[in-house]
Design a protein with these regions (language model features):
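Terminal accessory/targeting
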Residues: 1-20, 29-70, 74-138, 149-304
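Active-site histidine-anchored catalytic micro-motif
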Residues: 141-143
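His/Cys-centered metal/cofactor-coordination and adjacent catalytic loops
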Residues: 24
Length: 304
């Protein structure tokens, strides 16, 4: 792997542009507080909101103090309760709750759950956020469920309907992880992204962080930043938070997410130095313009 690149090596060139996007805002109190700490530090520039969070109104009120962070909807089909009664009724095998990602994927692909119900649910989730009110810049989804081929066009259509310019195009990082489960995930995501590429209306930021999901570290950032190419736009997915075992009772979530390490990685003062050294400029979705040729960065709107 290449080492750090000095300023003298890359000075005078256009910077690489990086959106650091925190998933799961509204998931738990500790998660939202951890995300906002990173926003305050200036490292997180966007966050996706759980529209079906039972804490939504309270957590949305905290965002008022942070107008510089871009907000999107973290579309959900895999955790907690749906907002629409019709989808809840269709999930009777799971007591009206969202099942895990594999169960919902199987139900969608087998047409046991009609995609019209998914469209209505996601529309409700978007409108739930707009009613708060939140200005929405992007859509993504919990556990990348919107990348399922029957669902990706729905996410794109809803984005057009509501004037939301950006939809995450999630892709794996090869080669990143060598565990059996990670290789299976990355293989599946490679196939899904290839299928969905035919539906993409324009370029999307280059996606980063799948291989480090739940485990973003300083070492990863040190290896990543020198590799970002001048003039390209990237989105780094992250999951910072404050772990609270009194609040989070699911041992699987605690095992998967190292919220504290991600928060510490993104709050570390050396991150800003590394960004500057490698000529990487943090931006938000608000700084992007979609054109026929792809993404254009509104550099004149980026504060220095």
């Amino acid at each position: 792997m290449s080492g750090p690149v000095s300023l003298s090596t890359r000075s005078g060139t256009e910077p690489a542009y990086l959106i650091i996007n925190a998933d799961d805002y509204g998931y738990f109190n500790g998660v939202s507080h951890g995300i906002l700490e990173c926003v305050q530090q200036g490292s997180v520039t966007a966050t996706g909101v759980f529209a079906n969070s039972p804490f939504l109104d309270e957590h949305v009120s905290w965002l008022a103090a942070h107008p510089g962070v871009d907000i999107g909807v973290h579309l959900n089909l895999t955790d907690r309760l749906p907002l629409t009664q019709r989808l809840s009724d269709a999930l009777n095998n799971w007591d009206g709750r969202f099942p895990g990602k594999f169960s919902i994927a199987k139900a969608v692909l087998s047409r046991r759950i009609p995609v019209d119900l998914i469209r209505d649910e996601w529309r409700a989730q978007i409108e739930h956020c707009l009613a708060r009110p939140l200005k929405l810049s992007f859509l993504n989804s919990h556990e990348h469920i919107h990348m399922l081929p029957p669902l990706y066009p729905i996410a794109l259509a809803l984005a057009r309907e509501y004037g939301i310019e950006h939809v995450r195009y999630a892709t794996p990082e090869w080669p990143r992880a060598w565990s059996t489960s990670a290789m299976l995930r990355d293989g599946i995501m490679s196939v899904l992204s290839l299928i969905n590429r035919f539906h993409m209306p324009h370029s999307a930021p280059i996606f980063l962080g799948m291989g480090e999901s739940g485990r973003l570290s300083q070492q990863y950032m040190s290896n990543l930043l020198p590799k970002l190419r001048p003039g390209r736009v990237y989105e780094l997915m992250c999951h910072p938070g404050i772990a609270d075992i009194e609040e989070v009772k699911d041992s699987r979530l605690l095992a998967y997410h190292d919220w504290e390490r991600e928060r510490q990685t993104l709050s570390d003062p050396t991150l800003k130095m590394a960004l500057a050294t490698n000529n990487v400029r943090l931006i938000g979705y608000r700084h992007l313009q979609t054109t026929r040729e792809g993404l254009r960065v509104r550099t004149e709107e980026i504060s220095t």
